[in-house]
Curated annotation (Swiss-Prot):
CC terms in the record's Gene Ontology section: cytosol
Function: Specifically methylates guanosine-37 in various tRNAs.
Swiss-Prot/TrEMBL catalytic activity: guanosine(37) in tRNA + S-adenosyl-L-methionine = N(1)-methylguanosine(37) in tRNA + S-adenosyl-L-homocysteine + H(+)
Gene that encodes it: trmD
Species for this entry: Onion yellows phytoplasma (strain OY-M)
Entry annotated with the keyword Chaperone: no
InterPro entries with a match to the protein in the record: Alpha/beta_knot_MTases (IPR029028), tRNA_m1G_MeTrfase_C_sf (IPR023148), tRNA_m1G_MeTrfase_TrmD (IPR002649), tRNA_m1G_MTases_N (IPR029026), tRNA_MeTrfase_TRMD/TRM10 (IPR016009)
Name of protein: tRNA (guanine-N(1)-)-methyltransferase
Assigned EC number: 2.1.1.228
Subunit comment: Homodimer.
PANTHER family per UniProt: TRNA (GUANINE-N(1)-)-METHYLTRANSFERASE
Residue ranges of coiled coil: none
Length: 242
C-alpha cells in the first residue's frame, strides 16, 4: 500500500515513521509513506498556504489551490482521497479494515487552523474524524489512521494478533496477564494457569463480553451473538445483579 500525506508539517511524521511497527513495515516494504509539504505548492513568494476567511471570521483557512495542485500531481485512478476533519465520520476498526483490505493508494489531507477551503471537498472521497473534539491540525489524526491501517496489512503483524484485538470482532478484548504469577497478593486468575484450553477459551469469551457490557454496552446493541455468547452474557448480567 502507498499512503501519501499532504501536510504543512512534514517533519511531524519523522519519529512516527522511525518507530515500532510502522518502521518495520516500511523497512519490509509492506507500506510506503510519502510526505508532501503543502507549502511547496504555494504560488506565493513567501510560500503562504493560508488566508483570512471570506465573509469575516476568526482565524486563517488553508487555501484551495495548493491542495488542488498537489492532488493533480499525485492522484491516480486507484487513489482514495481522505480529508481529516472534525466534521467527518468517526473513524473505527471497520474503516481501518476496509482501507487495509480494499485500497492500495491512500491520500490523506491534513487540515489546520480553521480548516480548509470548502472547494476541496468535491475532490475527496471521504471526510474522517478521530473523535468529537478539535485538534490543532490533522497530523495527529493522520498518524492514528496510518497506524490502524498499516498493522492490518498482510504480514505486518501476525494475523492472530489483530484478530484478537479489541473491536476487531466487535467486542472489547478480555483481560490479559503476564509474569509474575503473584505479586503482593495480586494473583493471576487460576484458570489461565490450568492448561485447560477449552476452559481458558470460555473464560476469555466471558470476560470479553463482560468488559464490553461494562465499558461499551453500545457495541452489543447491533452485535450478532452466538448461542454460546448469548448464554454467557445472560450469566454475566445475573452475576452483576447479585
Amino acid at each position: 500500500m502507498i499512503i501519501e500525506i499532504i501536510t504543512i508539517f512534514p517533519l511531524f511524521f519523522k519519529s512516527f515513521c522511525e518507530t515500532s511497527i510502522i518502521k518495520r513495515a516500511l523497512e519490509q516494504k509492506k507500506v510506503q509513506i510519502k510526505l508532501h509539504d503543502l507549502r511547496t505548492y504555494s504560488k506565493n513568494k513567501h510560500n503562504q498556504v493560508d488566508d483570512s476567511v471570506y465573509g469575516g471570521g476568526v482565524g486563517m483557512l488553508l487555501s484551495f489551490p495548493p491542495f488542488f495542485d498537489c492532488l493533480q500531481k499525485i492522484k491516480t485512478p486507484q487513489s482514495k482521497v481522505i480529508l481529516l476533519s472534525p466534521q467527518g465520520k468517526i473513524f473505527n476498526q471497520i474503516h481501518a479494515t476496509n482501507f487495509a483490505q480494499k485500497e492500495t493508494h491512500l491520500i490523506i489531507l491534513c487540515g489546520n487552523y480553521e480548516g480548509v477551503d470548502a472547494r476541496i471537498l468535491q475532490y475527496i472521497d471521504a471526510e474522517i474524524s478521530i473523535g468529537d473534539y478539535v485538534l490543532t491540525g490533522g497530523e495527529i489524526a493522520a498518524t492514528v489512521l496510518v497506524d490502524a491501517i498499516t498493522r492490518l496489512l498482510p504480514e505486518v503483524i501476525k494475523e492472530q494478533s489483530f484478530l484478537e484485538d479489541s473491536h476487531q470482532q466487535g467486542l472489547l478484548k478480555h483481560p490479559q496477564y503476564t509474569r509474575p504469577q503473584s505479586y503482593l497478593n495480586h494473583e493471576v486468575p487460576a484458570v489461565l494457569l490450568s492448561g485447560n484450553h477449552a476452559k481458558i477459551r470460555c473464560w476469555r469469551q466471558k470476560e470479553s463480553l463482560k468488559a464490553t457490557l461494562q465499558k461499551r454496552p453500545d457495541l452489543l446493541e447491533n452485535k450478532k451473538l452466538t448461542l454460546e455468547q448469548t448464554k454467557l452474557l445472560t450469566e454475566i448480567k445475573q452475576e452483576l445483579q447479585k
